[in-house]
Amino acid sequence: MEPKETLRQRWPGRGRTEETGAMKKSDDAPAVMTVEHLNMYYGSFMALKDVSMVIRKNRITALIGPSGCGKSTFIRSLNRMHEIVPGARVEGRVTLDGEDIYAPEVDPVRVRRRVGMVFQKPNPFPTMSIYDNVIAGLKLGRKRKKSELDEIVERTLRQAALWDEVKNKLSESGTSLSGGQQQRLCIARTLALEPEVILMDEPASALDPVSTQKIEDAMLELKEQYTVVIVTHNMQQAARVSDYTGFFFIEDMGQPGQLWEFGETEKIFSNPDRKETEDYVTGRFG
């Protein structure tokens, strides 16, 4: 195993430094979501096996691991988005503020409002303006005054680090924006619903370095008010922005994905407990 200092130098963190409000050595942030012994199936195929995890409030949790190990499947279980796939089902328990999100009386639409999702590929509504893209989800609820909608649009675009770039062209199509701007527009659209948790499935994988930096900066700002869970293949990104990291792994092709190791990001990247974790974060496979 490499010396600890070498691993730390390889993965300098940005999200946990004193300048950004460091995480305490003993984190006392409350749990906002708890996953207990989660198994997930698509038909008869077991995609995830026995995953347990605590997701803490106002923290960024990164999910890493090789392709096909269940990261995106897992993140979709956190707001029941996987249920749009025929034959998908879960065993185990997932709670949000102590409430089982899979309880029979729980409306999955309500879960998805409380746990928002930003997908890998930006997906602004092509027939809508930038303004209308932001408030699209609000149109399904109570009627709001124009002044209230204006405030929501400005606030969420500021939170997504996009306001200054679009404030003079809110009536233009959302698809007129660059890829990075479109992704930040999708973040603003998610924020307009005032979720407690924001899920991001490789939100910067298709973006250039400048756009990626803006997404990361936005994430670090967002965790002051929200809890963020991000799937990423970018080890530098996970090390820079996250407080906690979960490493997913499959032992062999056709086997279910498992949460191989979970803990504070500093430890996962500098002194992991399992050899497979070290091999992955140091680039020996994956």
UniProtKB/Swiss-Prot annotation:
Cite a single Pfam family from the UniProt record: ABC_tran
Q: Which GO terms describe its biological process?
A: phosphate ion transmembrane transport
What family is reported? Answer: Belongs to the ABC transporter superfamily. Phosphate importer (TC 3.A.1.7) family.
Q: How does it sit in the membrane?
A: Peripheral membrane protein
Sequence positions that bind ATP: 65-72
In which broad location class does this protein mainly occur, judging by the first location in its UniProt entry? membrane
Record's keyword terms, sorted: ATP-binding, Cell membrane, Membrane, Nucleotide-binding, Phosphate transport, Translocase, Transport
Q: Where in the cell is it found?
A: Cell membrane
Q: What is its EC number?
A: 7.3.2.1
Q: Basic and acidic residues: which segments have biased composition?
A: 15-27
> Source gene?
pstB
* Subunit text: The complex is composed of two ATP-binding proteins (PstB), two transmembrane proteins (PstC and PstA) and a solute-binding protein (PstS).
Species of provenance: Rubrobacter xylanophilus (strain DSM 9941 / JCM 11954 / NBRC 16129 / PRD-1)
Which Gene3D superfamilies does the UniProt record give?
P-loop containing nucleotide triphosphate hydrolases
| Chemical reaction(s) catalysed | phosphate(out) + ATP + H2O = ADP + 2 phosphate(in) + H(+)
All copies of the ABC transporter domain together span 33-281
Per its record, how is this protein called by name?
A: Phosphate import ATP-binding protein PstB
SMART domains in UniProt = AAA
Query: SUPFAM superfamilies of this UniProt entry?
Result: P-loop containing nucleoside triphosphate hydrolases
PROSITE patterns given in the database record: ABC_TRANSPORTER_1, ABC_TRANSPORTER_2, PSTB
Superkingdom, natural source:
Bacteria
First-level EC class = translocase
Matching NCBIfam families: 3a0107s01c2 (TIGR00972)
- InterPro entries named in the record: AAA+_ATPase, ABC_transporter-like_ATP-bd, ABC_transporter-like_CS, P-loop_NTPase, PstB-like
Return one GO MF term: ATP hydrolysis activity
Function field: Part of the ABC transporter complex PstSACB involved in phosphate import. Responsible for energy coupling to the transport system.
Q: Tell me which GO cellular component terms the UniProt record holds.
A: plasma membrane
Give the span(s) annotated as Disordered: 1-27
